[in-house]
């Protein structure tokens, strides 16, 4: 996808239950050295806490992607159509610590103001 429309969080009208629970998402971040890593997640949520819009996902401390998120001020949650299900499955089963797993998928890394995501995403949420 080469064109994106910016949507205010309060205007986001997609089913979070479907997106996260059924279609899955990629959690993607860049570390201080500029390397990008991603992981697949099928858990999380979106809502409002104390007047702030939030997106929530839980990442185990031993996950390689958590190191990237901890080093970054921003990360993305991105969603894909079903044709990328095998890619998301692969990205969720292999560690970027052991190999360049992104290179073994059909996904094309890109960024918005230095915040990484993939061109093929149908929805990208930039989180801070």
Which sequence ranges carry the predicted segments?
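Active-site-proximal mixed secondary-structure blocks
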Residues: 1-128
